Swiss-Prot record:
The keyword Repeat applies. Belongs to the WD repeat PAAF1/RPN14 family. GO terms for cellular component: proteasome complex. This is Proteasomal ATPase-associated factor 1. Inhibits proteasome 26S assembly and activity by impairing the association of the 19S regulatory complex with the 20S core. Keywords: Proteasome, Repeat, WD repeat. It comes from the Eukaryota. InterPro entries: WD40/YVTN_repeat-like_dom_sf, WD40_repeat_dom_sf, WD40_rpt, WD_repeat_multifunction. It holds the Pfam family WD40. The gene is PAAF1.
Length: 392
């Protein structure tokens, strides 16, 4: 695995001061870590800090919110990005999940303070409080319309809410344990959930009923993802004709990130197993990059890239630290990942550097939600951070 560059979490504040300093490190497996520092020498005429790096590190482009650092000896470069803005008043405690609406106007988040809130994405102003789950809410997401929210709680209930008036319009009951993740099929006539009870279920929103148990694997399912599978993949055939209430399940595959170190693929309409992949540790999350490629992240810091047509061996394993991989999602021609040590990074195929979203100081970044060139993250420190990406 390639070398990893790290920077002091509050580097942008530290380098605002005259002669301010921030530490750097370059860690390469099997070699001693190279430590260094950045020092501010002054300001350029455009008001951008003039930054010098210690031996072994090179400073590239600097803006008010970003700095490109390379370590030529290890042939590695990282662009560190500071938040454009932070919202610390949405919740009082750790924020466990968030999502941004399709139009970019609203955010929804859940917290260990026991609340789920809808807020304005531009300024963090709270618009609605979604009340009705017993115990903590684990996951929340907007439907594609951006007007409706799906949530899952430790109370084993799945709920659908109106973002406009905060009313709970549907409650799904059937799981025997806390709900850990959800997914939406197409436009949202059907939704999916997975639970500590070891099952993944398909639900009919219109009739608020369970259409099927898609998988029952005897191990908690930590994360799910649904995607259209490549035509060459045999998804199996249903044992009985699908209900007419089932909409958009054909040709889809459901990924299950399991606690028992297994990643499973199931034909969504057929309910038939497609593959079973053994990982190094519990799988926490998974996502599709395309109809052929998908990613899955483990508790010991591995990100597996797999090809749905042949899951015998991974295409690659990305490992930047031993911290749990908590969130994965596709972004442009690459992906965004967040980990339990506060790191959050973006990998793009055509970029020769990694983009590192900084400021969380060793607190897990639980979830990431992109909207166009803005990336929102939520963290154990109770802060929602919004990053502004330049032209990639």
């Amino acid at each position: 695995m390639a070398a990893t560059l790290r920077i002091q979490s509050d580097w942008s504040q530290a380098l605002r001061r005259d002669e301010g300093e921030a530490w750097l490190s370059c860690r390469s497996p099997g070699k001693p870590t190279l430590y260094g520092s950045l020092t501010r020498r002054g300001l350029s005429t455009e008001g951008v800090p003039d930054i010098a790096a210690s031996e072994g590190f090179v400073v590239g482009e600097v803006t008010k919110k970003s700095i490109l650092i390379s370590c030529p000896h290890e042939n590695v470069s990282t662009k560190f990005l500071a938040p454009y803005t932070t919202f610390s008043r949405i919740h009082q405690k750790s924020i466990t999940c968030l999502d941004i609406s399709s139009g970019g106007g609203l955010g929804v988040s859940t917290s260990t303070d026991g609340t789920m809130k809808i807020w304005q994405a531009a300024n963090g102003e709270i618009r609605r409080l979604l009340e009705g789950h017993v115990y903590d809410v684990n996951c929340c997401r907007f439907f594609p319309s951006g007007l409706v929210v799906l949530s899952g709680g430790m109370d084993a209930q799945l709920k659908i809410w109106s973002a406009e008036d905060a009313s709970c319009v549907v409650t799904f009951k059937g799981h025997k344990g806390g709900i850990l993740d959800t997914a939406i099929v197409d436009r949202g006539r059907n939704v999916l959930s997975c639970s500590r009870d070891g099952t993944a279920r398909l639900w009919d929103c219109g009739k608020s009923s369970c259409l099927a148990v898609i998988a029952d694997c005897g191990s908690p399912i930590n994360g799910i993802a649904v995607g259209t599978a490549d035509d060459s993949v045999n998804l199996g055939t249903p044992e009985k004709a699908p209900s007419e209430r089932e909409i958009g399940t054909e040709g889809k595959i459901l990924l299950l990130a399991r606690e028992d170190k297994k990643l499973q693929g199931v034909g969504l309409q057929s309910r038939q197993p497609v593959f079973l992949f053994d990982g190094s540790d519990a799988f926490n999350c998974c996502t599709f990059l395309s109809s052929t490629y998908f990613l899955a992240g483990t508790q010991d810091g591995n990100i597996y890239q797999l090809d749905v047509r042949n899951t015998n061996a991974p295409i690659q394993i990305i490992h930047r630290s031993g911290a749990p991989v908590l969130s994965l999602l596709p972004y442009r021609d690459g992906f965004i990942a967040s980990q339990g040590d506060g790191t959050c990074f973006i990998v793009q195929q055509d970029l020769d550097y990694v983009i590192d979203l900084t400021e969380a100081d060793c607190d897990p970044v639980y979830k990431v939600a992109p909207w166009e060139k803005q990336i929102y993250t939520c963290c154990r420190d109770g802060v929602v951070r919004r990053y502004q990406l330049g032209d990639l």
